[in-house]
Amino acid sequence: MSNVTLSDFLLIVLSFFVPFIVVGIRRGFCTADFLINICLCALGIPGIIHAIYIVIKYPRTVRLDIENSPNDPLVRYTPNPEHAVSPHSGPAPPSYSSLASNDNKHQSP
């Protein structure tokens, strides 16, 4: 058990009480590992063994804050240029009254 951190140790201890929660924390609650562990928990001991296996096999991943990383060379901020309003050329569109001149409620035969 190399590179077992304090959080891994606490998850292993917690897996003796609620192993499916440990698998949900480590792998996600909508994953196949979570559903497998729920089925194994019905059998008892295999659910605990599976939860300990998941904690050891999949170490905690470090989530990087990509948006607020000032030293990352792959993330560059480029400001958008000001959008200039182009002059409108051509005739004005027709008004609604010229398009809908007759009343649509009364239809003539």
Swiss-Prot record:
Signal peptide from the UniProt entry: none
Keyword field contains DNA damage: no
PROSITE patterns, per the entry: UPF0057 (PS01309)
Membrane topology classification: Multi-pass membrane protein
Annotated segments matching region Disordered: 75-109
Any single Gene Ontology cellular-component annotation: fungal-type vacuole
Keyword Phosphoprotein tagged: yes
Keywords on record: Meiosis, Membrane, Phosphoprotein, Transmembrane, Transmembrane helix, Vacuole
Modified residues (Phosphoserine): 69
Transmembrane spans: 5-25, 36-56
InterPro entries linked to this entry: PMP3
GO biological process, one term: meiotic cell cycle
Localisation: Vacuole membrane
Domain of life the protein comes from: Eukaryota
Pfam assignment, any one: Pmp3
Predominant location category: membrane
Summary of the function given for this chain in its UniProt record: Has a role in meiosis.
Family per similarity comment: Belongs to the UPF0057 (PMP3) family.
Protein name, UniProt field: Plasma membrane proteolipid 31
This protein's encoding gene: pmp31
